[in-house]
């Protein structure tokens, strides 16, 4: 498989994943919220607002807004760091763990699906019939 084929496959998997997330019942996460959630759940060490901001190269207020929304959805919880009361630790929740597990399944299904532009025989947008 060539590099271009790999890229098309990845784009197709991403598209299928995003479409499935949009269609399902549940919270509609922004790209930033999803990046914060994935970082919190896929990194082994505890995450802080400061650390997330550095890792994702965004401002602390942007991380705080994303965490506010994720906390509203009960996907993360904040706790003051007992060793440094100025720092806030981001904790995982059962609902967030379930979302990540479901996301993995959605991605597996999307990876097996038809490539981009081949959804049920529909033509790729922007292409004229020949």
PLM regions with names:
Residues 19-58:
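N-terminal helix-turn-helix DNA-binding core of bacterial DNA-binding proteins
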């Amino acid at each position: 498989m060539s590099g271009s084929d790999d890229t098309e496959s990845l784009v197709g998997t991403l598209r299928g994943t995003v479409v499935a997330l949009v269609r399902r019942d549940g919270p509609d996460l922004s790209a930033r919220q999803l990046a914060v959630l994935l970082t919190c759940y896929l990194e082994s060490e505890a995450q802080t607002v400061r650390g997330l901001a550095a890792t994702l190269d965004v401002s602390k207020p942007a991380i705080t807004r994303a965490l506010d929304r994720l906390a509203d959805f009960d996907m993360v919880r904040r706790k003051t760091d007992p060793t440094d009361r100025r720092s806030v630790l981001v904790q995982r929740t059962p609902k967030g763990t379930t979302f990540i597990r479901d996301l993995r399944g959605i991605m597996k299904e999307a990876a097996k699906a038809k490539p981009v532009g081949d959804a049920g025989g529909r033509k790729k947008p922007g292409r004229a019939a020949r």
